[in-house]
Each structure stands twice: as structure tokens, then as C-alpha cells.
């Protein structure tokens, strides 16, 4: 029996990004099909689509119109496309949409903490919980109550998380990671980096991830 090929996967993304929810679910399905062939360790890296977003957030329709010039009808079509893609990969988007765009910096600080002081599986679980809270239930991912509920859900230390949110722990580390990836050409997400060498950009179907990972594993 062959030994599975070990792969490091850095998943660069933002909780605010619906395609990141689709992409992560697709990647997970691909890895399930490659079980026994590939042994992957996922690391979640920060990217902010709207780093200047204030605590009050912004209506999602107004935000997308201002940022991209899209009409509400165009946005509805895109939202339905994303919803269908999510359903294909096992991610259920909230039927009414997200409602508002929020700042995600504190969520990234907690994810960094989970990666530093927790196990990779806990960081992965927290990422999933945050994506479901925002895209699945339209909750506010900048709200400490929502963030702490996600922390509890995945079994991380709520007292430590509360202290992080009350201060500025891991703020510099998150900004450094964001700068690292943007300086290396990552300007859209999701970006999936395999073994720090191979880049897969975008929320591809699970079949595409499976094919790419299989090829990379054969070369490793």
C-alpha cells in the first residue's frame, strides 16, 4: 500500500467572500476523494476584501453597486449562481442573502490565534463556522457575540478568545500575513497555494481541485 503524499495547503481567503465558501467546500470534497492518496494539512491565511469597512457595515447591494457598478438585477443573478454552486459542493447559502458587508479583521485575528495556539483541525473548524455564520445565517462576523459563539462551537478557549477581542493580539501578525500574500501577487480570493509553489485561483469545482491535487501529488 502506497504512503499518502503529504501536501501543505495554504487557503488565502476572506470570510466576506462567498466564492471562498464555495471554494473551501469544493476543496474539502476533493480531499475526501483523494483520501489515501493525499495527506493534506490546511492552513488558513488572511485576506480582507474591505479592510476600511467601518463597524456599522454597509448594505450589500449598495456596497456592490458602489464597488463594481453592478445593478441589483445583476447581483441577484450572480447570487443565484453562487447559491447553486454552493449547493453542488455542499454549502448552503442563506436564501435571503447576506444583508450587509462587515469588517472581518477580528475574525482573522481569531483564525490566526487558532492556527498558532490550536490544532490545524481547530483552525479549519473555526473557518467553517465563520463562513456558515455569515453566508449561511447572515450573522455579523464583526460582532464579538457571533465570533465567540463560533469559538465555543469548535471547542476553542472562549476566555482566551474574549481577551484577544478586547485587545489587539495578533493584529500585527495578521497584517504581516496579508502584506506577504499581496506582495506575492495575491489580489483576489480564494487563492489556494500547494506546498508553497503551486497556485490555484478561484472557487473551482471539486473535480478541478481533485485533478490539480492529483497531478501535484504525482510530482511531489
Segments from the language model and where they lie:
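C-terminal cap of thioredoxin/glutaredoxin-like
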Residues: 4-12, 16-36, 44, 111-112, ...
Amino acid at each position: 500500500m502506497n504512503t499518502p503524499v503529504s501536501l501543505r495547503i495554504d487557503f488565502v481567503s476572506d470570510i466576506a467572500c462567498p466564492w471562498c465558501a464555495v471554494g473551501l467546500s469544493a476543496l474539502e470534497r476533493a480531499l475526501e476523494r483523494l483520501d489515501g492518496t493525499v495527506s493534506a494539512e490546511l492552513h488558513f491565511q488572511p485576506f480582507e476584501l474591505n479592510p476600511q469597512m467601518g463597524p456599522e457595515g454597509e448594505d450589500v447591494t449598495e456596497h456592490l453597486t458602489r464597488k463594481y457598478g453592478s445593478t441589483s438585477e445583476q447581483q441577484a443573478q450572480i447570487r443565484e449562481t453562487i447559491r447553486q454552486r454552493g449547493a453542488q459542493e455542499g454549502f448552503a447559502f442563506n436564501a435571503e442573502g447576506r444583508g450587509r458587508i462587515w469588517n472581518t479583521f477580528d475574525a482573522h485575528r481569531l483564525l490566526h490565534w487558532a492556527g498558532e495556539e490550536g490544532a490545524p483541525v481547530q483552525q479549519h473548524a473555526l473557518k467553517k463556522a465563520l463562513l456558515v455564520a455569515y453566508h449561511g445565517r447572515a450573522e455579523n462576523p464583526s460582532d464579538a457575540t457571533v465570533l465567540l459563539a463560533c469559538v465555543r462551537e469548535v471547542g476553542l478557549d472562549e476566555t482566551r478568545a474574549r481577551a484577544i477581542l478586547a485587545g489587539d493580539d495578533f493584529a500585527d501578525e495578521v497584517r504581516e500575513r496579508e502584506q506577504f500574500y499581496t506582495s506575492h501577487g495575491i489580489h483576489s480570493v480564494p487563492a489556494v497555494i500547494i506546498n508553497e509553489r503551486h497556485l490555484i485561483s478561484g472557487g473551482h469545482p471539486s473535480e478541478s481541485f481533485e485533478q490539480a491535487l492529483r497531478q501535484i501529488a504525482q510530482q511531489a
